[in-house]
Amino acid sequence: MPTETLQTGSMVKPVSPAGTFTSAVPLRILNKGPDYFRRQAEPNPKRLSAVERLEADKAKYVKSQEVINAKQEPVKPAVLAKPPVCPAAKRALGSPTLKVFGNHAKTESGVQRENLKLEILKNIINSSEGSSSGSGHKHSSRNWPPHRSEATDLHRHSFAESLKVYPTQGRRSPQEGGSHVGRRLLEQSAESFLHVSHSSSDIRKVTSVKPLKAIPCSSSAPPLPPKPKIAAIASMKSPEADPVEPACGVSRRPSLQRSKSDLSDRYFRVDADVERFFNYCGLDPEELENLGMENFARANSDIISLNFRSASMISSDCEQSQDSNSDLRNDDSANDRVPYGISAIERNARIIKWLYSIKQARESQKVSHV
């Protein structure tokens, strides 16, 4: 064995149990006694407030004996006093019999409310059934009574009256006359239909009937007469409306009024401009004389005698049917007439083509003169 281990072993001394206890617990705790441990064992040790500490040291800073003897209590918030409860009431509240009685009262009140609601519903159902059944027949049987009651007749009569369309006062055009005839037929059919039918679904059918519209002309229908000119319409009307009616048709402004001479001048100028543009491709008379009228023979055959006018779909259909009927009757005369129905695109293309031909004619004349 080495000598170092022997020396360390000889230096170690045995330790007594008393020495271990004194080293683990300090001496100042042992000197405090058992009261120290009791105070630590208490859950919340009471601490003195500032008032209590001042009360204990009052003799140090107060001279009069009266103040020293007087004890100052801390100010506490006022506690609201509860109303006193009788002991009998306490026992009654605490007993289970009262709770059971309260539950029974609640259930009885709920049952009464439900019964009241059921009675109200029954009354409503009975009243609706009585009003709908009329003379006591049920809806399930679907057998109508032989005679209607006065109330239902009055109601249906008022409903039929509400469907009527009364004519407005004023002048009537010949086209409006046919519509009034259609309205009368509709009224008569509606009245008869209402008196015959009994169910609400039939009445709904009457209300869904739309007003009659003007039936467009088909190929088999007779053609409408052509529209009269403005001058003819103005001559047919009364002399009082003469200065007002043409102005409305021309200027579309009812407040603007023009004299007859001004209107005729405007019509003449418009016709002249249209003729110059479509017949002579917008050229002045001097240019036409220089170029020669023979260059416009083809233009005159295609464009000169065409009647350009705007028309609605109904009038165009009627005119086409009129043309077809007249073609069947007069085949020879149809070949001599100028064809109708050239579109605006084709018309513009012809105008552009003739303008181009005039330009080429000018260039050829310049080349020939040179």
Curated annotation (Swiss-Prot):
UniProt GO cellular component terms: centrosome; cytosol; mitochondrion
Residue spans of biased composition, Basic and acidic residues class: 326-335
Residue ranges of the region described as Disordered: 127-151, 237-256, 317-337
This protein's UniProt keywords: Cytoplasm, Cytoskeleton, Phosphoprotein
Leader sequence residues: none
Keyword hit for Phosphoprotein: yes
InterPro entries listed in its UniProt record: FAM110, FAM110_C, FAM110_N
Tissue note: Detected in thyroid, spleen and testis, and at lower levels in stomach, spinal cord, lymph node, trachea, adrenal gland, prostate, ovary and intestine.
Chain positions with Phosphoserine modification: S238, S301
Family of the protein in this entry: Belongs to the FAM110 family.
Function per UniProt: May be involved in tumor progression.
Protein name as catalogued: Protein FAM110B
Native source species: Homo sapiens (Human)
